[in-house]
């Protein structure tokens, strides 16, 4: 299917070159499925552009990180013990880092990110030393890999990390990155110095109990802003009312805010912000639209089944759903009307794979 991609790209470039004005290039959706497939989907035609086999996946694809030039997809695979880089067009493996060794079993629990210049991967590692008679749990760490290291990449440096981290997000200036866990941590990417800690579980919001969030999906496109639903209880007199808030983190400015928007916990998984930043969309057993100007629930519809992951088109007109089963769903962003369902070839399960949006080149 790589050949068909190249022919389509050649045709598209020829048409673009002869047209009077440039037309927006279509969104491409990137997702992974069991046991070892990476799919590139043309959102404009609701069709699979390419299907790549991922070497060494060993059953499942978890987190997907896209390089800044959008040419390489970095995939967490093999029971969270290996990271591979796949050329999006050709399907060729261009990077591999085996995290574990015979002496140490290392897991990356979803959390990894890439530097804005595309030169380094930052990976959250949970190591366990394999002794002859016992397993010794070691301290978590951040490991940094050079993306040009080929198929035998080793960490070029590492530094101590907190426990219970599940999302890493690089800041656009390349100097630091965020780690989301019990709290929001910021680290210097070169020295590993902790630059600051802000509250998530330790937030200081009057009349709110300790919050909870499940932020496994590091989606920040197209705005550069990370959002996640946060569940808590708000004390009203003698009662406590279950409430959902939206966590909003601007990666460029560093601004962090929480906004209550509904008095129940129907939304617990991923959210994404619209390009105009006036709406957020969330998914679980329902599809939810949130007004992010007034921070109120706009509308909600039931879904055919649970979806774990959500993204939005670059023009803000469509919502993309995935992360479970073998279907990717397309919904109208304004009305939440279902527009199409794409069943992936072989109907293999996406499980917890990240749903990413890139652009045709």
Go through each PLM region and give its residues.
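Bacterial N-terminal signal peptides
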Residues: 1-14
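Predominantly soluble domains enriched in secretory-pathway, periplasmic, or organellar proteins
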Residues: 13, 17-361
């Amino acid at each position: 299917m790589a050949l068909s991609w190249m022919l389509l790209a050649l045709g598209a470039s020829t048409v673009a070159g002869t047209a009077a004005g440039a037309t927006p290039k279509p969104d491409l959706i990137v997702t992974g499925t069991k046991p070892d497939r990476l799919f590139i989907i043309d959102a404009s035609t609701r069709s699979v552009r390419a299907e790549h086999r991922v070497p060494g996946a060993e059953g499942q694809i978890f987190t997907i990180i896209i390089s800044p030039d959008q040419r390489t997809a970095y995939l967490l695979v093999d029971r969270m013990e290996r990271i591979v880089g796949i050329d999006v067009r050709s399907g060729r493996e261009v990077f591999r880092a085996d995290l574990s060794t015979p002496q140490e079993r290392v897991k990356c629990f979803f959390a990894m990110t890439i530097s804005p210049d595309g030169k380094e991967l930052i990976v959250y590692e949970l190591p366990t030393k394999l002794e002859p008679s016992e397993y010794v749990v070691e301290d978590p760490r951040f490991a940094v890999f050079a993306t040009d290291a080929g198929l035998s990449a080793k960490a070029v440096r590492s530094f101590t990390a907190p426990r219970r981290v599940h999302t890493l997000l690089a800041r656009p200036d390349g100097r630091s990155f965020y780690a989301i866990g019990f709290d929001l941590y910021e680290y210097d990417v070169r020295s590993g110095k902790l630059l600051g800690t802000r509250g998530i579980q330790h937030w200081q919001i009057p009349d709110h109990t300790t919050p909870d969030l499940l932020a496994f999906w590091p989606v920040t496109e197209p705005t550069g802003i990370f959002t996640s639903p946060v569940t808590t209880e708000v004390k009203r007199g003698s009662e406590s009312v279950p409430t959902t808030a939206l966590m909003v983190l601007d990666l460029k400015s560093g601004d962090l805010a929480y906004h209550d928007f509904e008095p129940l916990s129907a939304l617990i998984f991923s959210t994404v912000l619209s390009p105009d930043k006036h709406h957020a969309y969330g998914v679980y057993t329902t599809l939810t639209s949130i007004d992010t100007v007034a921070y109120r629930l706009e509308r909600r519809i039931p879904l055919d089944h649970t979806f774990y992951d959500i993204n939005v088109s670059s023009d803000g007109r469509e919502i993309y759903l995935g992360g479970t089963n073998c279907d990717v769903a397309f919904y109208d962003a304004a009305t939440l009307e279902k527009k199409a369902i794409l069943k992936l070839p072989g109907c293999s399960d996406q499980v917890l794979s990240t749903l990413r949006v890139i652009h045709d080149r």
